[in-house]
A protein has these predicted regions:
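N-terminal carbohydrate-binding accessory modules
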Residues: 1-46, 57, 72-76, 80, ...
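Short, well-ordered coil/turn segments that N-cap beta-strands
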Residues: 12-14, 41-43, 75-81, 143-148, ...
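The substrate-binding groove and active-site-proximal loops of carbohydrate-active enzymes
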Residues: 15-27, 50-65, 112-131, 153-160, ...
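Conserved, mostly hydrophobic/aromatic
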Residues: 18, 37, 45, 74, ...
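Short, acidic/polar
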Residues: 25-39, 130-136, 253-264, 322-330
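Aromatic-lined substrate-binding rim segments of carbohydrate-active enzymes
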Residues: 32-38, 46-109, 235-242, 461
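Polysaccharide-binding and catalytic clefts of secreted carbohydrate-active enzymes
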Residues: 107-270, 274-288
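Carbohydrate-binding surfaces of carbohydrate-active enzymes
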Residues: 199-202, 245, 254, 265, ...
């Protein structure tokens, strides 16, 4: 893989900065803001995210003067700008004049004005005015010397269930299916006599309406995803009329269920996301989210658009980041592919729902606080680091298959248990690789599979057209596939495959799934391997038959004791494993550890528990990020005979590296081709 070019050649450095909302403050504070930003080495400010009313106090009146001053001041201070469109929160005048722009809740009831992302994505009025504002901003500022990126709207979110959406949904369905007969066939509406005889009879899946046709719910999710994406694209195209060479993005939200970020990433010039860990999150959870963002555009570095410099305000418990955690988490983002470290927000708001959200400058306005000191020290360190990490790629040999439509269909499915645990299962299969410092890409239904040696596809309930054939070809060509129970059950309309489970995967897996047993909490079974090792399993247990697959493990209890629970099928030059049950974590650690050894996939660096190591490779050098997530010192043995430059201290290291608690190191060594 070749390294990537800088996101914008006018800003070839790690983007350090964050959300800046000067419209909330008197002009007398602006110069002090800029002085303190320079002290922190802020290089990029995100401006204008929620400034619609400040820019357009009435439909016929625009007030850009204050923004002119802000951008000019930032440019004079040496700070670049990621300029946002303010469409995430419409003005009160807009909702009052055009009440049809307001979102409707899942019962179809129109919401009142307030909050944010409270618009109907199919509203022609909303679309017109949002695109108009984007065009005016681009026309006015496309040549501004501070401009380095466009930030469209903010954290696109939930579905709307209004009459406009219902009508647009019916049009969308006509385009998708062509005829009502075809829709009825694909939705299986003969069940419970729910056959539609006129398009006008189809409604959104209201909370107090139709909920028994899973294909309806699945299609409505697809439809709403497309409508919101159209809103993004309308603003993007409005910007591109005037600003063709500046990257355009929007900020995503981790594993957000309601939007298919793979489809969104195709329309973005760079992926950006907002990282807000909860108190329950472990470092591997954030690593997985970073890997998702890097993978959405097939390995392209991403932007960490927001993180709190300390606490949040919307979690059940808004824990302060302990000294050193902000720095460690920022470097973890860089380690997984980020090209920026940015905060929400610069100055804490005096009022509103986020007045207690963490910020670089607190209500006191002081710069002698713990948080400010940590932000300033990190900025100075990143300035010294320079551009060494930019464009670095992560050469992963392991792919973890994830699909939003599969998630939607699986979670909506009635049976065999209410708890499908898709994300929890994805995490469980990711964890053994993360703990071993083996890089992982998230892969998708349309990804290029040939670059991987091992592909893990848990709970692949819904199979998109052509995916089974591509997985079979991957195995035939020498790849190793691992999949699980609940895989290969339905097609894209949530119709069960007529020849049973695992549907089109049956040949490559060499098994047939007869039944699925759902075990209630507290009830378990055993997965017994052929060598006698035994592991607890439970939750869901598929009762399968081998059709050519080698049986590696069997159930140890209940009426299906002795039935296959783990199989391997050799096909062509590759192999496909089927795990019929949900095993304890110890099994996955053992299974993937042995599989990696067999395949010859090595960690980027051997480390003690609690120390994470990742690899980013530029055109000139390999960069090993080593992060001690523990509170105690840890020593890492370095590969024999190799010398590394530690970029944060300038030390030359051989044999060993000792890290204090929450400490970070970046070890650089030249590529052989660059020597």
């Amino acid at each position: 893989m070749e390294a990537f070019a800088p996101l914008n050649p006018r800003a070839p450095f790690i983007w350090y900065g964050g959300d800046y909302n000067p419209e909330q403050w008197p002009r007398t504070i602006w110069d002090e803001d800029l002085r303190l930003m320079q002290e922190c080495r802020f290089r990029v400010a995100t401006v204008g995210v929620f400034s619609w009313t400040a820019l357009q106090p009435a439909e016929e009146r625009f007030t850009f003067g204050w923004l002119d001053q802000v951008l000019d001041k930032l440019a004079a201070a040496g700070c670049k700008v990621c300029l946002a469109t303010p469409s995430a929160a419409q003005p009160a005048w807009l909702s009052q004049r055009y009440p049809e722009v307001l979102r409707a809740d899942p019962t179809g009831r129109r919401r009142h004005h307030g909050w944010r992302v409270n618009y109907c994505p199919t509203s022609p009025v909303y679309r017109r005015l949002a695109a108009q504002m984007a065009a005016k901003l681009a026309e006015r500022y496309h040549a501004h010397p501070a401009l380095v990126a466009w930030h469209v709207s903010n954290e696109y979110a939930p579905a709307c269930y209004c009459e406009q959406c219902a009508a647009a949904f019916r049009d969308w369905l006509r385009s998708r299916y062509g005829s009502l007969d075809e829709l009825n066939r694909r939705w299986w509406t003969r069940f419970w006599s729910h056959t539609y005889t006129d398009w006008s009879q189809i409604e959104p899946p209201y909370a107090n309406g139709e909920g028994s046709i899973h294909a309806l719910t699945l299609d409505y999710r697809r439809f709403q995803n497309e409508m919101l994406l159209e809103c993004f694209k309308l603003e993007r195209e409005a910007i591109r009329q005037f600003s063709r060479d500046v990257p355009i993005t929007t900020n995503l939200m981790r594993f957000y269920r309601d939007l298919d970020y793979r489809r969104w990433a195709r329309e973005m010039d760079v992926v950006a996301w907002d990282c807000y860990p909860s108190v329950e999150d472990e470092p591997l959870d954030i690593a997985l989210a970073h890997d998702l963002m890097r993978s959405l555009r097939d390995g392209q570095p991403f932007l960490l658009m927001e993180q709190s410099p300390s606490s949040q305000n919307w979690q059940p418990y808004n824990r302060l980041k302990r000294p050193g955690e902000l720095r460690l988490q920022s470097y973890q983002a860089l380690a997984h592919g980020a090209e920026s470290v940015m905060f929400f927000q610069w100055r804490r708001s005096r009022g509103g729902i986020e007045k207690l959200h963490g910020a670089v400058i607190e209500h006191s306005g002081r710069s002698d606080t713990r948080v400010f000191e940590e932000v300033r020290a990190l900025g100075q360190e990143l300035e010294r680091l320079g551009a060494r990490t930019l464009g670095g790629v992560t050469p992963a040999q392991v792919g973890l298959l994830f699909d939003w439509e599969n998630w939607w269909a699986l979670e909506d499915c009635s049976g065999p248990t209410r708890e499908k645990r898709y994300l929890e299962t994805l995490r469980a299969h990711y964890a053994p690789f993360w703990r071993r410092n083996v890089p992982v890409d998230l892969v998708f239904w349309d990804s290029e599979l040939g670059r991987y040696r091992l592909l893990v596809a848990p709970l692949l309930y819904l199979l998109k057209e052509g995916l089974a054939e591509r997985l079979a070809a991957f195995v035939q060509d020498g790849g190793t596939l691992v999949t699980t129970y609940l895989s290969g059950m339905v097609d894209e309309c949530d119709l069960a495959f007529e020849d049973g489970y695992p549907g089109p995967l049956r040949h490559v897996l060499g098994i047939w799934n007869e039944e699925i047993d759902a075990l209630p909490p507290g009830q378990t079974n055993r997965l017994v391997l052929h060598d006698g090792r035994s592991f607890v399993c439970g939750h869901l247990c598929a009762l399968i038959h081998s059709e050519g697959a080698e049986v590696l493990g069997r159930y140890g209890e209940d009426f299906y004791a002795g039935r296959p629970a783990l199989t391997r099928h050799r096909v062509g030059r590759g192999q496909a494993f089927y795990l019929a049950c949900e095993p304890e974590a110890a099994f996955l650690e053992m299974f993937y550890g042995e599989l990696l050894a067999t395949l010859g996939i090595a960690p980027v660096l051997e480390t003690p528990p609690g120390v994470e190591a990742t690899l980013r490779q530029t055109d000139r050098e390999r960069l090993l990020f080593v992060l001690n997530h523990g509170r105690e010192p840890a020593t890492v043995r370095l590969p024999a005979g190799r010398t590394f430059e530690e970029l944060l201290t300038g030390r030359r290291l051989r044999e060993a590296l000792t890290l204090a608690g929450l400490e970070v190191a970046i070890l650089a060594e030249p590529l052989a081709s660059s020597l």
